Amino acid sequence: MVPREQAEEAIVADSNGKEEEVGVMGVSAGEHGADDHHGGGGKFSMKNLLWHGGSVWDAWFSCASNQVAQVLLTLPYSFSQLGMLSGVLLQLFYGFMGSWTAYLISVLYVEYRSRKEKEGVSFKNHVIQWFEVLDGLLGPYWKAAGLAFNCTFLLFGSVIQLIACASNIYYINDRLDKRTWTYIFGACCATTVFIPSFHNYRIWSFLGLGMTTYTAWYLAIAALLNGQAEGITHTGPTKLVLYFTGATNILYTFGGHAVTVEIMHAMWKPAKFKYIYLLATLYVFTLTLPSASAMYWAFGDELLTHSNAFSLLPKTGWRDAAVILMLIHQFITFGFACTPLYFVWEKVIGMHDTKSICLRALARLPIVVPIWFLAIIFPFFGPINSAVGALLVSFTVYIIPALAHILTYRTASARMNAAEKPPFFLPSWTGMFVLNMFIVVWVLVVGFGLGGWASMVNFIRQIDTFGLFAKCYQCPKPAPALAQSPVPLPHH
């Protein structure tokens, strides 16, 4: 087995070769295949600046912008269910736990890729995905589990972005109901089929994070300026169902690394990804903690019936700007969630190595249709996050990576020949295994068990209250018009 340094060099070499050869990734031969070009020694072009992203910074922007998105608007709702102290502590707890499992995924990717490269396998015209890593390291049953959970999570992750688009635009233009806006934004988001891979999200990731940063600080400042209305109460937590629903939404918030492998594969040096997700999470804390805390302080228990933070803030130009920027970012995040699904579908129908972007876009369109349909059936912005977090995120990005790491390195020979040794802050294999088992047990019991129970109770309650295919979820009821009949003229 190649040691860690050689494994990294092998990965870099293959990545560069891939970028020179794969036109479908948006990079042509000789354009910037050499590593010294990526370092700044080659010819500058606007196309490279905006379209070809594979640096450490590109990966950081992708992770940070993909992680926060629309959950920024539902975290105040979660704080009202949890209370201030639990809300802050659980954000920190799940943020660091998510960073650890993202690290495990990156280690397993490097292990899989270094083994395959030693066997002479080429990844030209092929994007490695998480289920393929599981297949290569642990066999077909793990591949099936990874494929099922990952694809279902990404499917509903895309659904959530579409629901959020309709929910947000309603606060600018309420002449159309949220269901109609879902139809419109479903068509708009379908244009993501033309973006070949994560390699081509450079400018979008940068803009997306900037937009989310504006929205987060708008929420915090607007809430503080609004102040506490008279009679505001902060009673959370009051019910176990609400508590674990809120906790699971936070688990969902910091479980956005279902696309980690695809982001790594788009890097010029994938082995440098290890701590990027942690650094992205630290930045995300500066957005989520102030905004959620300020909103809960200002509005308290009112948030229990307002899952979208925008709904409680006064309509101003600042709010409209935040809504518009969040809409654009949700379009970007929709693409992030859908792109791995596009890859899977391409591989199923044999179109993954097709070089024509238009043909691939046409082949991808069937993926958008079920997303569109599900967003119309379940328009429950907020509660759906918790349900997806408990039933899908708990396995996809917490339990499966932790178990996969334990089983991959369960033998002494596997540990001795590992492409990545334990990190400096936890230099013991035993320590890593103990931490992994803690994550498995915690998420299985608290996230999937209690969180699943609470989230499904809350989700079913939304169906009972609003019904499937709800036309305008949580929209304010129009004031009843006073029927004023004309006064009859006296007869003479």
From Swiss-Prot:
It comes from the Eukaryota. The keyword Nucleus does not apply. Residues 86-87, 165-180, 224-240, 296-322, 386, 454-492 are extracellular. One of its GO terms (cellular component) is plasma membrane. One of its GO terms (molecular function) is symporter activity. Residues 1-67, 109-143, 202, 262-274, 344-364, 408-432 are cytoplasmic. It is found in: Cell membrane. It comes from Oryza sativa subsp. japonica (Rice). The chain crosses the membrane at residues 68-85, 88-108, 144-164, 181-201, 203-223, 241-261, 275-295, 323-343, 365-385, 387-407, 433-453. This is Auxin transporter-like protein 1. Belongs to the amino acid/polyamine transporter 2 family. Amino acid/auxin permease (AAAP) (TC 2.A.18.1) subfamily. It is a multi-pass membrane protein. Carrier protein involved in proton-driven auxin influx. May mediate the formation of auxin gradient from developing leaves (site of auxin biosynthesis) to tips. Its main location: membrane. GO terms for biological process: amino acid transmembrane transport; auxin-activated signaling pathway. Keywords: Amino-acid transport, Auxin signaling pathway, Cell membrane, Membrane, Symport, Transmembrane, Transmembrane helix, Transport.
